[in-house]
Amino acid sequence: MDSLASAAIPAAMPARPSGRADTAFFGHPVGLGWLSACELWERFSFYGMQALLVLYLSNHLFLPEHIGQVAGIEALRHAIESVTGPRSPQQLASAVFGLYAGFVYLTPLFGGVLADRVLGRTKTVVLGASLMALGHFLMAFEASFLVAIACLLIGVGCFKGNIAAQVGDLYAPSDKRRASAFQIFVLAVQIAVILAPLVCGTLGEKVAWHWGFGAAGVGMLIGLVVYLAGRRWLPPEPALGPRRAVDRAAGSAAAAERPSLTRRDKARVGVLVLLLPVLVLSIVGNQQYGNAFPLWSEKHMDMVLLGWQVPVTWLQAIDAFMSTATMLASIAFWRWWSKRRREPDELAKMGFGALVAAGGPALIMVAAGVVDASQGKVSLAWTLGYTLVNDIGFANILPVGLALYSRAAPQRLEGLMIGIYYLHLFVGNTFVGWLAGLLETMPGQAFWGLHAALVASAGVLLLAFRFVFRGVLAADDTP
């Protein structure tokens, strides 16, 4: 694949318009359009596969008659069960899904190093897209499942951070179009998140699993073709080789001139690190939406709408649509609030968000009680309630937390602290995979009540952190 990436990109590319002169794409550089289109198709493939994964594993691949065909699965199963104890097919599926969802947030750290020091961003993105396409197609074969997952994880690591960095590289540091550029970029992601479960999920559930995974692979190939077609509009690559050595030397000289960390800087770093376990608790209700919730819904939710059996994977599309709407509503609400009274700080918003988000699994706890009482199924209205309440709360947790770490981190450690912030998603998804394994052994009310309690406790702890460490984390210009 490394040779493929090298062959696909010519040594010299035609010059592209640069700076403010390039406004052909809705006032932005043409490269933004190509990068956004590529990201749309990459996210289509990613979320299409993810919508199917836990259902495919628990309902097919990890059943006794199939699991023996998977190369290397016994070693992985032994490693998981050495920590958790014996796992049923559903429990093993949830654990593997949790590990996959967690490592997705870890591998981009290595992809960034590969791009910065060895290949450059463009070649690394092409390598990542090629590996992801290969991984999606390998998912069609039972024996190659773990190889497919490895290709997907390495591919995401190579692709994700570097294509976002290329969006930023289209603009000069003082160019005020940068913020709106990332809004366009994120909008492309949201379109993909809505469409992917509808297409890949429907094919996987209604036709055959490999059709869904194949559709995801086709989406990734389209993304790769789009990226290569628009390569002349991509930003210039940072210098590698001897030039990079000069840049590193200059960077070392600049670093020597930076002031050392102050006592307050060290206190801030300590508080931000202490926050990580609380952040892990705050996301368990949201992250379970892609793991335990589809499994529970498949058994206990009436998925018939107007006489048609709605695929369980469509729940992911509902969540994507709702999360987009609630994110926009949250932004509008806080703008309205700030014009009338003082806007709360980040920890206050996050604490409020976690307390609201706890209502999502609490609603499913009630729904589980209805299931137990009636011995029947509950309507899709419970899904809409869970999604709406959870997404209102989550809109004030994840992005607000990112803003907190970006603002409060000492300037010389900002990149490191952002990376540390994302580690809570790695740990959180792994933890959620273990929690999802309890779905088979705990009553539904207790299972979802546990999640509501964990998220609510995170809300209380976030507000306690605000009370205790408000002075440490306050903005420098706070009176």
Per-region residue spans from a language model:
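C-terminal ends and interior cores of transmembrane alpha-helices
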Residues: 130-147, 354-375
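Glycine-rich segments within core transmembrane alpha-helices of 12-TM secondary carriers
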Residues: 104, 177-205, 212-223, 319-323, ...
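Conserved MFS/SLC helix-loop-helix module at the cytosolic interface between two early adjacent transmembrane helices
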Residues: 107-137
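Transmembrane alpha-helices of Major Facilitator/SLC transporters
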Residues: 229, 308-339, 352-361
